A protein has these predicted regions:
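Short Cys/His-rich zinc-binding micro-motifs
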Residues: 1-3, 49, 150-156
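Recognition helices and adjacent regulatory flanks at domain boundaries
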Residues: 3-4, 30, 135, 156-157, ...
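Iron-sulfur cluster-binding cysteine motifs and their immediate structural context
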Residues: 6-17, 53-69, 84-101, 159-170
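Intrinsic disorder/low-complexity detector
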Residues: 20-42, 99-120, 124-126, 170-178
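Ferredoxin-like iron-sulfur electron-transfer modules
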Residues: 31-51, 63-84, 98-105, 109, ...
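C-terminal accessory/binding modules appended to enzymatic or scaffolding proteins
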Residues: 125-134, 139
């Protein structure tokens, strides 16, 4: 989180004594996630939140609602919004589940995106998408996922996964558009 050439590593972590011990569970999404039943859709939520807030949408009255309140409505328009919001979650926290139990995932090309959060005036994590494997320091692979966020600030309690600690830490890599 202190590189002078962010988002690239310049070795500063060694000079600062950074301890990057991995603390994230290697349990699968299915093992971590709770099931939330709507009227006509089911959403799986594993609580790994990077605080990107794509799970919120503005309703017809101009008020912000979250995916959980929209899911409870259960009408066609709401179901469409729930699918969109769940698919937009870069952390992969939220997934709509089909009637057969399959997680409905968006088709994403492999890539890694540096995320900034101008609304909170902080730099966020790395959005990894398109089923890019994640290997732990000991060589064990995490479950292959379509979407996840990696910590960049170095302060996550779920390393290497982003847990939104960058927000209270006011992490700034020097590239936030203000």
């Amino acid at each position: 989180g202190h590189s002078s050439s962010a988002p690239f590593c310049d070795g500063t972590h060694k000079k600062r004594g950074f301890v990057g011990a991995e603390t994230a569970s290697t349990d699968t999404f299915d093992q971590r996630a709770e099931t939330i039943e709507g009227k006509s859709l089911t959403v799986r939520d594993d609580k790994r939140c990077a605080f990107v807030r794509f799970c919120h949408a503005e309703n017809a009255q101009g008020e912000r609602e979250n995916i959980w309140s929209i899911l409870a409505k259960g009408d066609v328009a709401s179901d469409s919004t729930v699918r969109e919001l769940a698919s937009a979650c870069p952390a992969g926290r939220l997934n709509v589940q089909s009637e057969s139990g399959e997680l409905l995932e968006p088709e994403l090309k492999p890539g890694i995106t540096v995320v900034q959060d101008p609304e909170q005036a902080v730099s966020a994590g790395l959005y990894v998408h398109g089923y890019i494997p994640l290997e732990s320091a000991d060589g064990e692979e995490y479950e292959l996922r379509n979407r996840y966020m990696l910590c960049r600030c170095g302060l996550s309690r779920e390393k290497p996964i982003c847990d939104a600690t960058h927000v209270p830490a006011a992490f700034d890599d020097g590239h936030i558009e203000k």
